[in-house]
Amino acid sequence: MYELQQHRKFSALDEMLPAFYYCYLLCFPVSSDNRASTSELLQTSLSSLAEERPYLTGTVRRDMESSVRKGHLILDIPNPFEDLRIVFNDLTGPKSQWKETYQDLKDTGMPPHKLDANLLAPLTAGIGETRKVMSVQANFIHGGLLIAFCFHHNFVDAYGAGRIIARFSDHCNGTVDLKNSADPEGDGTDSRGIADLLDVELLKKQYKFEDLESDPNLWRLNCLEFRGVNDFRWPDFIPALLPVRKPPVISSMFSFSSDALAEIKAMAQPNQSGAWVSTNDALVAFLWRHTMRARFPSSRTESEPPNRKSNVVVALDGRKDLSISPTYIGNCLFHCFTDLPINMVGSESTHLGDIAIKVRQTITAARNKTLLKAVVGLAATHPDCQTIKYANDNLGPDLYVTSWIDLPFYKLEWGPLGKTEFFRIPDRQFESLCCILPPKDGVVQLITSMEEDHSKRLRSDAEFTRFATYR
């Protein structure tokens, strides 16, 4: 079973993240005859989960007058208790904008460009009429069910969201007995709901901002602006409209077989004696190369300005590195930057192993407990959460790769619903990111969101499509 921490308080890392919602979709075949019983199962189970962990019914508030620091986050939990209600959305009626059957979507591999967040999600990515920490919407289509889970990113990272969904499945599966269940021991958060390593108030007694602010690596690992070139800021708080991307982006999904991944790893073996890269390092290097070629075609021939740099940013879960309990659902996310000249990344003459070993070296260097504690120290001592800016330009010379390979969605049992058939994110959910999905039947899928011209160029790249199948 997937236990959750008993209490929840916002951490230094939570406060560094932009205030927006993101959505996960879990897809199941469900006949129309079972809709009523399925709806009852879902609501009963979510109510049971909310009763078990009332902080899941809470809302996020930013305190601009806090004695801790300006913009300190507060979690308001309703008292008396308020239930967490599912939004049930019937998309099978004759007047519905939704036309696809579940079988139609299944036959085409459940492509994300057909999964419109405006129809399926209780909260569109980045835009909210609420500050709830999470919301759930159950969408019934002909022959199936698409459950949308929306989470506030200040509240939870991908691992934590997966943990909450997994605990929800425990309730659906009937394996949780609230009357006789014991709270998890040793989750490291006690009644304060936060591990000491992440507590803003404790960290401010250990670190000083002026001792840390001159180290660009600490800023990078927080994904905060350090180069002085990026003026983009997220809205101060939701509800707020995000800037419209011009030109707009489109989502595409690609699949890599286990044989394709093995061949990419073989291509990416470094020339240095004794050097080693993982399959993930090799895949990141491969994606970085071909994404930059799609955005900057002249990088193939090293014709970009020689001083133009590119970054690939890999999201790292720091729980193991910081010895934080797996029951902890808050953000424990670090951002590992590898930078190279863009001509080197895109060049036909650059060995893939030279890129992959750089990725491996920066990841290895980042997984240092002393370093990560200082990164959290910078996050805790920053004087104003509202003045921070973010460090990468993901639609330009940078690529952000986040891997959800370890999320348990395909392992979960949902009682009468069985196992999850598809895990997806809605169309354009993470603009400009490259998201690696949990593997299914030995196949790894990833979703990219790119400008349309760049996406077309990627799909026509013969070297890329030799290994990647477009969905």
From Swiss-Prot:
Entry's EC annotation: 2.3.1.-
Pathways per UniProt: Sesquiterpene biosynthesis
MF (Gene Ontology): acyltransferase activity, transferring groups other than amino-acyl groups
Keywords associated with the record: Acyltransferase, Transferase
Job description of the protein: O-acetyltransferase; part of the gene cluster that mediates the biosynthesis of PR-toxin, a bicyclic sesquiterpene belonging to the eremophilane class and acting as a mycotoxin. The first step of the pathway is catalyzed by the aristolochene synthase which performs the cyclization of trans,trans-farnesyl diphosphate (FPP) to the bicyclic sesquiterpene aristolochene. Following the formation of aristolochene, the non-oxygenated aristolochene is converted to the trioxygenated intermediate eremofortin B, via 7-epi-neopetasone.
Oligomeric and partner information: Monomer.
Record's protein name: Eremophilane O-acetyltransferase ORF8
Annotated organism of origin: Penicillium roqueforti (strain FM164)
Record gene name: ORF8
